[in-house]
Amino acid sequence: MYQLIDGFLDVVGIFFIVYLIGYSTFLFLSVVVGSIQLYRQHRQRRLQNYLPNDYHMPISIIVPAWNEAVTVVATVHSLLDLEYQAYEVIVVDDGSEDDTSQTLIEAFNMHAVHRPIWRQVPCQPEEFIYETRTQKVPFTVIRKKNGGKADALNMGINAANFPYFICMDADSVLQADSLKKIVQPMLEDRHVVAVGGLVRIANDVELEHGRVKKYRLPRNLLACMQVLEYDRSFLASRILFDQFNGSLIISGAFGLFRKDVVIAAGGYNVSTLGEDMELVVKLHEYCTVNRMDYCIRYATDAICWTQAPERLSDLKKQRRRWHLGLFQSMMKHRGIL
């Protein structure tokens, strides 16, 4: 009996040793490759500053919102002040129980419009549409029946006027030059179908007009630990996966997509918890099955700031949703693994 227990413990010990060696090697390679790529991008960015670039890809920014009346006006103000020339902002109110839509309508002096929305991907029907042309950037609010974040994003895709769209969270803030940065991979390579941005923790960071006024680590220990986690992931692991077109996720907080390819792939899946990851895996599958030359890229200098949970209960809910979404995506698209 004791020999069986000793044998089992030996196997477990060997497994953990192999796992630690493998994971440490992965982290080491991620840091090395990430450092090299960041240095190359820094040199390339210095060169681009001296080159004229007057072309701007037209982009639709889609912001799904549910019960965001407190923060949504500030979010929209920050989006309307981005350093970019050709874009529109679409806020999709997913059946909020508060005054999300009314707050926006009053704050931006919007008026009701009646225009058909072509359902290229399925979504719940709209209740009303408001627009404003008093801003320098076209701004639209769509109120629809509740169907979840993925359904709201599908509505935004259907309503978007431009061939490229960005999805982001209502509580996130894009850095002022983020659109200029995230379009670069698509301008450099016509085969790019999606680009992920760099998501950073905004807790205790002072932002003004899309720029960092004062940066400091969060006072909350849990949020501070997430800063290290995010930087390790976005500045190391994702750069490594980007080298061989292996990115399996673009954060729902900030990602750029080609609308025609997303529509052809079926849009966002409303039945999964991780709609952002499921879409990227689905794009890989769709492009592979249809023998398309494609790549999914990652822009390390296109920055989005987001709030991290500071309570353990909130972090638990977030990570549970992420891991269940990962499991659902892998099961649904296990054929490409």
Residue ranges: model-predicted function:
Residues 1-13, 17, 239, 244-246, ...:
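Basic/Trp-rich segment in TM-proximal cytosolic loops or flexible interdomain/linker regions
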Residues 1-55, 238:
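N-terminal membrane-anchoring/stem segments of glycan-assembly enzymes
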Residues 30-86, 102-105:
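N-terminal signal-anchor transmembrane helix
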Residues 57-60, 88, 263, 278:
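Cell-envelope/extracellular polymer assembly enzymes that use nucleotide-activated donors
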Residues 77-142:
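Acidic donor-binding segment of Leloir-type glycosyltransferases
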Residues 113-140, 145-154, 158, 162, ...:
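Long helical/loop segments within the catalytic core of UDP-sugar-dependent glycosyltransferases
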Residues 165:
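Short aromatic/hydrophobic "clamp" motif used to bind/position activated sugar donors
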Residues 261-266, 272-298:
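A short, conserved alpha-helix in the catalytic core of glycosyltransferases
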